[in-house]
Amino acid sequence: LPITESFPEDSYSIDVVGKTIWIKGSGKGVLFAAYRYVRDIIGGRKWYAGHENTYIPKSTSLYVAADLKIFSKPSFQYREVYFPVELDQEYMDWYGLHYLEDKWGDWGHTASKILPPSIYFKSHPEYYSLFDGKRQPAQLCLSNEDVFTHTVVYFKRRMVENPKAIYWSIAANDDRGSCTCDRCQAIDKREGGPQGSLIHFVNRVAAIFPDKKFTTLAYLETANAPAHLCVADNVSVILSNIDAFRKNDITVESSAATFRRQLSAWKSKAKHVFVWDYLTQFTNYLAPFPIQGTMQKSLHYLKTQGVEGIFLQG
């Protein structure tokens, strides 16, 4: 089916009409509907990757309610559970999940992909952040016009190489060290921090490609929303809640109070907000960590706050 407002991407319906079972869907919706049928009607189960973790009951007869009507549309337009299990495409389809390489041309922290320090830092240190009184390759100088030009050229090339990609990330490296040059500081002082020069830069690049979708990361030094700037409509902000403890769901967890405030602020500045969440307890990676009691409440909260995409990192 065509993707519409009432039947968005990956939506589906299962209806019994007379003696016929009608399965309809948009995007991958038909496939997701087929697995829903296997789960809910046939009683199949898939606990993890691999056929050995899949159960399909054997029966000589199957009963389907004559008035069966199911309609389902995703709560989030992007849904990824970043575990090794995502290498099993059947598992991903069974639960209607995404894999970042199916959607992103460039994902995550991209500053060093756009201008690799190994190539440019020695000859053009001015492309990189002025930090602690000297140029360092920790981040880019986002007020440098040559950095802007290089970035535009980079994405033009990458979009030709990967024309099917939906999202393109423009984001700081996984580190601190944002630029403190006079030009960057002029923006950052007005906007409340390095998120100012980042959003100003991302908006400029996004304006060159109005028919493309970009993402950026609200994380570490850029976690707070800018004081005045709004985010371009073709840019999605991915906000991290890495500082929140995992004992309670994020609606009541005291250490998530900052995240809740940041989310509200970003929602007032950006049309599209995703969340980068974590399914682990950082104090001990190897300890068993049950999440069933908290994750559903957290996801429900994010949905009610208008979050459009979820990346759950294990």
Q: Which residues are covered by each model-predicted region?
A:
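Feature activates predominantly on carbohydrate-active enzymes
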Residues: 5-200, 204-211, 215, 236-238, ...
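Active-site-proximal structural scaffolding
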Residues: 74, 144, 198, 202, ...
